[in-house]
UniProtKB/Swiss-Prot annotation:
Protein name per UniProt: Glutamyl-tRNA(Gln) amidotransferase subunit F, mitochondrial
Compartment annotation: Mitochondrion inner membrane
HAMAP family, per database record: GatF
Species per Swiss-Prot/TrEMBL record: Candida tropicalis (strain ATCC MYA-3404 / T1)
Function according to Swiss-Prot or TrEMBL: Allows the formation of correctly charged Gln-tRNA(Gln) through the transamidation of misacylated Glu-tRNA(Gln) in the mitochondria. The reaction takes place in the presence of glutamine and ATP through an activated gamma-phospho-Glu-tRNA(Gln). Required for proper protein synthesis within the mitochondrion.
GO molecular function (one): glutaminyl-tRNA synthase (glutamine-hydrolyzing) activity
Known catalytic reactions: L-glutamyl-tRNA(Gln) + L-glutamine + ATP + H2O = L-glutaminyl-tRNA(Gln) + L-glutamate + ADP + phosphate + H(+)
Amino acid sequence: MSKKKEKKFQESKISTRSYRSTTMLRHQIRRITTANRLLDELKTSKDIEKFLNNSTWSIKELLQQPLTNTTTKEVSSDVVTKMLKLSGLSDSQDIQNIRKSLNLQMMFINHLYDKSGNNAEKKVNDNNCMFRLLASDHIPQRPLDLDTLMDEINKLEPSEEKGEIGFGIKDLQRDSFVINKK
């Protein structure tokens, strides 16, 4: 940092992190060719710092219950009980709170993956296939022993589909180096 910038930095009495943020933002603003209202408001470093420190939205806004119940599908207590059994956790007496928090998490995840970008309409996705639980998914596999592992290694062959192309000595000799056998 030059002495002139350092003096200006000390006079402004802002933190190093804020200074870096404002400097980066200032450089980005200079690059923008089209003007808008936001650029007119952000002229000084104090304006930029004030803008960066003010939040414009909250996660709590996204976690509100949907306005309409026509397309919503909530997690039932049976699903929560099944998830607790399959996870190996003890059956909790507080299933209603777990169900409520799972519904909120699903609503937030659906908001993150909402492709329409319409935040005003809060709805829960009907596609529950992401959250299905099958007992067959949790069957442990047979343990791998040394003999089985050695057999699988011996059976390996290069796969052209995966881009594993084998080569021989003849292919190596086309390059600029030579292999001498003794």
